[in-house]
From Swiss-Prot:
It comes from Bos taurus (Bovine). Residues 1-12, 202-211, 769-780 have a biased composition (Acidic residues). This is G patch domain-containing protein 1. Disulfide bonds: none annotated. Residues 896-905 have a biased composition (Low complexity).
Length: 931
């Protein structure tokens, strides 16, 4: 409160509520501590705090709703004489006194009204609001905008406020109250009456004297200057109405089709005159836009002329904006023009156009030259060599440009040495950079002579082609026919030294290759129109030109380099897959049908494509459709490989006819691959690298290839009948193995076969579990093994002695070798690598485990007593077997001589007692037959 004391000379202002004066002798009361304070209501009564279910203090008069009697419904009485007034209830009518108090949910706080608000708000917005409220169907309806529309504050607005900016102030450095008047330049002449020196505003100068020098103020809020460039035909500072925003979004003047009156009766403001049923008083947004969100464009907003000034007047101070002028002031001029422009009756609902339509200027198409080609043709880049000099000349003539002088070449075409020569620098002598520098002087002179001869021949060909082209040329620019003629002449001169009999650049297109061969034949005969005769008459001009260039380049470029490439490179043993590309599978074989349908002009189902497309599983899930291929892992179109098609297919060099030796070797390789692919893979198969690293397998294969197929010459030590028997037995073994391969490859030999080959005597003694699984046929097995060992040892002794006695003779290997190798490879597919077969008794050894396996299956279900009895028999048999081995060793040592030491060492122990290291050592000592 402000109290004004008129009696005093000074103006005093007091804020707040004053304390009551204390009486004499009264002491001021001490403040009550927080823990001793109690909660009371307005009447001084204690307030009780309830439990968890009430949630706070009492809700009224002793847990009632505000009164002793509680809440009673209000009575409603209405009669014809006394009508009940409609009571408008607000939220405050349903609240208690506690809710309206200072700490309630709706406190009655002091709110600044509009009378004390800032007067420096957006004046344009205030003016538009007043005009809209005055012309609205419901007067004052725009006040609802202030109640519904939230505060539209941008992020920059909030940041400026936090930085100290206030609404109505400008942005920039602070200034003084009024800028000092600038003193006029003394050099400027002033015509007329001189102004008073002090200025006419003396009162403002007096006010400035009271202000201190260090006080500054915020700058004035002014509208910034818009530097938008002028892109229309209006006058300066004129802003016409946008037809897309004004007059309800209709371009041009508005007219009403259903009103009988003239256009002048239409309302200028456009609020009510267009549609009487529309209420256009309320616009804007209700909620949903916060202070930090950008406002969306209001698509339902309407522009009317009521928001713009229709009368020219002076500017308001500080406004800085100009009003919009009404466009209908020119209607009187347009009315006079209507009678002059159009004679007749205008239809109802239509008006005559005020401006004629601007006619578009149509420009004629450009004139095409005679040698114009719709597709740009990139000419090949050919290196400037002695062989291709005539080709460079032909290319330059067909392009219509003379060849560039070497002295006038671009700097990008010169290297460092050539630039140094042009500048006259002395070259730096360093290490030789070319192979030609290592040649002797005689070789250099010989190369120079050959080069001069080739250059002379190329010059003669060039002169001949130039003479032929000059004879039929005219002053006009060179046409494509002249260029093609020079091509023919150059080709006819260079065909003598080329050999293109094996060169087929268009092997993939037989018809094109046939035309190419016909073209070469015509060129050899010397016919001038050789190319025109062999071309297809059904081709277009562009295709004929392209094929003409392809034939010429194929004949020139690749015939000369064929000999060089063949001397440096060899033919590939495997087919390269680079000439194939992936295309949709359904597109592979339907090209001919489509082309035939297009030629017959049967468009429709025949020319349509139907593809098998596998969608992604997520796509089917998003569109809620079943997957047509649930088990497919492919996405998209199934693809297969087919040949590429390119204009430069002929650039690949074809293979020449291979010699019979290479064909035979390739056939052998193919047969070997086919045999490898035909057999099933096994887990005992080893890779090529492992086979190379395995020394045991290496020597085994060496012994197999040398000893196995070798047939010694007939000698008195070898019986012919014995050789025939071994040969027949080996053939039978091979035939049986081949038949067994065709019958079934999944069967695998039993473990007894591997035990008989690789197991040693110590293993037999220690394997007690294997003894329990034995059968009654072990005696027969032992006798068979002993017979097999003895026969094998004797055969080895005879073979080694024969190999030492007989001299090696140049003899072709028997055809038994590849069959035996294939047989051993088939055995290896079912287990580890077996030792080499040196004797014809291998069949007996292979048949024995098969019979034992069959009998073993029959004897499996015998009682334990029989197993014990067999175990005792086996122990006795082992003792006799061991004694028999020792006796055999002694007899073999006494009977063998010193010359056959290697064969004796081989026969000391059977195959079952040899370790891999011992077998390797003995195989190295075997006398191998040399070719």
């Amino acid at each position: 409160m402000a109290a004004l004391d008129s009696d005093s000379d000074e103006d005093l202002v007091s804020y707040g509520t004053g304390l009551e004066p204390l009486e004499e002798g009264e002491r001021p009361k001490k403040p009550i501590p927080l823990q001793d304070q109690t909660v009371r209501d307005e009447k001084g009564r204690y307030k009780r705090f309830h439990g968890a279910f009430s949630g706070g203090f009492s809700a009224g008069y002793f847990n009632t709703v505000g009164s002793k009697e509680g809440w009673t419904p209000s009575s409603f009485v209405s009669s014809r004489q006394n009508r009940a007034d409609k009571s408008v209830l607000g939220p405050e009518d349903f609240m208690d006194e506690e809710d309206l108090s200072e700490f309630g949910i709706a406190p009655k706080s002091i709110v600044t009204t509009d009378d004390f608000a800032s007067k420096t708000k957006d004046r344009i917005r205030e003016k538009a609001r007043q005009l809209a409220a005055a012309t609205a169907p419901i007067p004052g309806a725009t006040l609802l905008d202030d109640l519904i529309t939230p505060a539209k504050l941008s992020v920059g607005f909030e940041l400026l406020r936090k930085m100290g900016w206030k609404e109505g102030q400008g942005i920039g450095p602070r200034v003084k109250r009024r800028p000092r008047r600038q003193k006029p330049d003394p050099g400027v002449k002033i015509y007329g009456c001189a102004l008073p020196p002090g200025g006419s505003e003396g009162s403002e100068d007096e006010d400035d004297d009271y202000l201190p020098e260090n006080v500054t103020f915020a700058p004035k809020d002014v509208t910034p200057v818009d530097f938008t460039p002028k892109d229309n035909v209006h006058g300066l500072a004129y802003k016409g109405l946008d037809p897309h925003q004004a007059l309800f979004g209709t371009s041009g003047e508005h007219f009403n089709l259903f009103s009988g009156g003239p256009e002048e009766t239409g309302d200028l403001l456009g609020d009510i005159g267009v549609n009487k049923g529309r209420k256009l008083g309320i616009s804007g947004q209700a909620f949903g836009v916060g202070a930090l969100e950008e406002e969306d464009d209001d698509i339902y907003a309407t522009e009317t002329l009521s928001k713009y000034d229709t009368v020219l007047k002076d500017e308001e101070p500080g406004d800085g904006l100009y009003g919009w002028t009404a466009p209908r002031q020119y209607k009187s001029q347009k009315e006079s023009e209507k009678d002059l422009c159009y004679v007749g009756k205008i239809l109802d609902g239509f008006s005559l156009a005020s401006k004629p339509l601007s006619s578009k200027k149509i420009y004629p198409p450009p004139e095409l030259p005679r040698d114009y080609r719709p597709v740009h043709y990139f000419r090949p880049v050919v290196a400037a060599t002695s062989e291709n000099s005539h080709l460079l000349q032909v290319l330059s003539e067909s392009a219509g440009k003379p060849t560039n002088d070497p002295g006038t070449r671009s700097r990008h075409q010169l290297n460092a040495c050539k630039r140094g020569e042009l500048l006259g620098e002395t070259p730096i002598q360093g290490a030789p950079t070319s192979v030609l520098e290592f040649l002797s002087q005689k070789d250099k002179e010989r190369l120079k002579e050959v080069k001069q001869a080739t250059d002379l021949k190329a010059a003669q060909l060039r002169a001949r082609s130039l003479a032929q082209s000059a004879s039929g040329s005219r002053p006009q620019p060179l046409s494509p026919d002249v260029g093609h003629c020079s091509w023919h002449m150059a080709l006819s001169g260079g065909m003598a030294s080329t050999r293109t009999s094996n060169f087929k650049p268009f092997a993939k297109d037989p018809e094109k290759q046939k035309r190419y061969e016909e073209f070469l034949a015509n060129m050899k005969r010397g016919q001038k129109d050789a190319l025109e005769r062999c071309l297809d008459p059904g081709m277009t001009e562009w295709e004929r030109g392209r094929e003409r260039d392809e034939f010429a380049r194929a004949a020139l470029l690749y015939a000369s380099s064929h000999s060089t490439l063949s001397s440096r490179f060899t033919h590939a043993q495997e087919e390269d897959d680079s000439e194939q590309v992936e295309v949709p599978r359904d597109q592979e074989n339907d090209v001919s049908d489509k082309q035939s349908a297009v030629k017959m002009k049967m468009f429709g189902k025949l020319t349509r494509d139907t593809f098998e497309w596998h969608p992604d599983k997520l796509l089917c899930k998003r569109f809620n459709v079943p997957d047509p291929y649930p088990d497919s892992t492919l996405v998209g179109l199934p693809r297969v490989k087919r040949d590429k098609y390119s204009v430069f297919n002929f650039l690949t060099i074809p293979e020449t006819a291979s010699s019979p030796v290479t064909q035979a070797s390739s056939e052998k390789v193919a047969q070997h691959r086919a045999s490898d692919k035909s057999r099933k893979p096994s887990r005992w198969d080893t890779s090529k690298e492992e086979k190379k690293e395995d020394s045991i397998s290496e020597f085994l294969s060496l012994a197999r290839s040398k000893v196995g197929p070798a047939k010694p010459e007939p000698s008195p030590l070898v019986n012919k009948e014995e050789a025939r028997a071994t040969e027949s037995v080996s053939n039978k073994v091979v035939n049986k193995d081949v038949d067994s391969q065709t019958e079934g490859e999944g069967s695998r030999p039993s473990m007894d076969l591997f035990k008989a080959i690789f197991a040693s005597s110590s293993d037999e003694k220690s394997s007690s579990s294997e003894d329990e699984q034995g059968d009654s046929e072990d005696d027969q097995e032992g006798t068979r093994e002993a017979d097999f060992k003895s026969s094998q040892e004797t055969d080895l002794v005879e073979a080694s002695s024969v190999a030492q006695a007989s001299e090696p003779a140049p003899q072709e290997p028997a055809p038994f070798f590849p069959i035996q190798k294939m047989q051993i490879d088939e055995r290896e597919a079912f287990g580890p690598r077996l030792p080499p077969v040196f004797c014809p008794n291998a069949r007996q050894k292979l048949e024995a485990p098969l019979k034992e396996k069959h009998k073993k299956n029959k004897e499996k279900h015998k009682t334990k007593k029989e197993h014990r009895r067999k175990k005792e028999k086996k122990k006795k048999h082992r003792k006799h077997k061991h004694k028999g081995k020792q006796k055999n060793k002694k007899s073999e040592k006494s009977s063998s001589s010193e010359s056959t030491d290697s064969s004796d060492s081989q026969s000391e122990e059977g195959p079952t007692d040899l370790s891999p290291q011992e077998l390797l050592r003995r195989l190295k000592r075997l006398p191998l037959r040399r070719q």
